[in-house]
Amino acid sequence: MGNVRAYIYFGALLSFVNHKLGVTMSNWLSDSIMVKKGEANGKQNSSHSITEDSQGKYHYVLGAYAEPVLTVDPGALISVETHDAFEGKIEKETDKPSEILNVPYLNPQNGPIFVNGARKGDTLAVYIKSMKPRGEQPVGTTCLISEFGGLVGTKDTAMLNDPLPEIVKKVVVDEKGVHWSKNLILPYQPFIGTIGTSPEIEAITSLQPDYYGGNMDVPDVAVGNVIYLPVNKDGAYLYLGDCHAAQGDGELCGVAIEHPTVTEIQVDLIKNWEIANPRVESEKFFMSIGSGRPMEDAVRRAYRDLVFWMEKDWGYDKLEAYF
């Protein structure tokens, strides 16, 4: 499943975007869609936590059939203890993913979180306040998995060449960086790989991205940014997990620097603001995320949403926005 994010950062909206530049995070957030339209207007009204113990069972599908682990009002600040994508099962570099992992039981999700007042046609706003690695080092895990990734044949697209060997790399991850080797420390740039609301009636694997969010693996779903998710079911049923310490655009080999975290989010609710697919707002950009196959369809979905967004919310002529 391809993912594309499209940005609004060009002439038509440059003056609006520049209004955000050079200001502190707190100031830009006060000018955000979440604060302007949200029921809580960016104000924190309660604090909660979801630990491994309180979560209990992690979920491998996004759906409305699991009992909510937490019920909150808009404005709630929530600290969440997430697992890595493998639920901690890969412990050492001699481990073989093919022997340890039980596909499709990957990408364990915290939640669901029930948000009071959320109804179909509303939008859930999630501000990602902070992310920190947790657990005993080395907490970072990445690997090559046979027949998995963007430059290899898969079981569905088999080639004559032999599959790549299985390789596991464990790395120390702290707030100073990803300690890849003695000579290389990568920046610590954490983001939420999988986040979404429940579809209306389906329960869909957490490995899949679509209109409700899911396994998008978009690096902009990061600390300091707000992701907007469509509400398809009363209560929204928010899930999140699969946090990454570092990743390029695309997760080409199929696996990022996976790590468990303590992730702090603040949720708000925007009534009667209906969106077709996830959107992200940062200090500099408005973004739309399109998911689909082939990748061309993901591109069309993302840019189409931007065009309609500009037309509906900022008053641009549709064809002018298309330019």
Annotate the PLM regions.
Residues 130-223:
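Intrinsically disordered, low-complexity linker/loop segments enriched in Gly/Pro
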